[in-house]
Amino acid sequence: RLSVRDFRISDAAIRYEDDSTNMRFSTAPLSLRLRGNMSADRTDLDLRLTAAAMRFVSGGIPLLSDAEAELVAVIDADLANNRFTFSRNTLRLNAISVGLDGWVELDGDAVAMDLKAGCDKVQFKDVLSLIPAFYTREFKNLTAGGELSMELWARGEMRGPALPAFELKTEVRNGSFQYSSLPKAVTDINIAARVSNPGSVMDKTVVDLSKFGLRMAGNSVAATFYATNLVSDPVFRASADGRVD
């Protein structure tokens, strides 16, 4: 076991590319500081991680562009039993802060966990700042309203292809946005989405977009989407209703 009390990484650059899935991730600079008595059976790990200019592309689609992230965490580390309990933890992505609680235990090739995370009443403009299509040089001229909330939990064991039970729920309420150069705003943005798995293989994952609606220049659009059996025999249901003049 390492006799380390203070470990640091400063101004690192990380780049990951997977040509088979057209996935790209990069960030620079990245800094990490980890404090704790790593030679003890049990210790508090004080972790601070910052990353700037984060870029993430999946399937050729830009999902993050020049985002900033910060993780501040105090972890109760039971090093003798490889069990780590999270408390007083905050992950920030741009202006969005997410709290994290729970524990993770490493057991051979398995990872057991009981985790939950969430954020409440995040400003809709802060969410738009994460989307490359919105976060351009014109972003400062964007006015936006509305709120987003998110809840995530994962419980069980991850081993090989087996996943723990998990659920991610997110909701956008009364969202709106408008660029100063455009005559009309997009209003009444209301979204309710859920991704869940009962604790099995990826094939059992359910994607349920039960509500998607907005109004633009007097035209309204509403849609729903449902998918499951994504690997073996995909099942999809979708609906759309709208008027565009």
Q: Predicted segment positions?
A:
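Amphipathic hydrophobic-ligand
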Residues: 20-35, 61-73, 90-101, 129-155, ...
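Transmembrane beta-strands of outer-membrane beta-barrel pores
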Residues: 51-55, 106, 119-123, 172-176, ...
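Elongated, acidic membrane-bridging lipid-handling scaffolds
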Residues: 1-83, 193
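Solvent-exposed loop/turn tips at the surfaces of repeat/solenoid architectures
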Residues: 7-14, 28-30, 52-54, 89, ...
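Flexible, solvent-exposed coil segments and beta strand-coil junctions
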Residues: 10-12, 52-54, 79-83, 127-135, ...
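Transmembrane beta-strand segments that form the barrel wall of outer-membrane beta-barrel proteins
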Residues: 83-90, 206-212
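Short loop/turn motifs that connect adjacent beta-strands in outer-membrane beta-barrel proteins
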Residues: 160-164, 201-204
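Transmembrane beta-strands of outer-membrane beta-barrel proteins
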Residues: 45-47, 113-115, 166-168, 207, ...
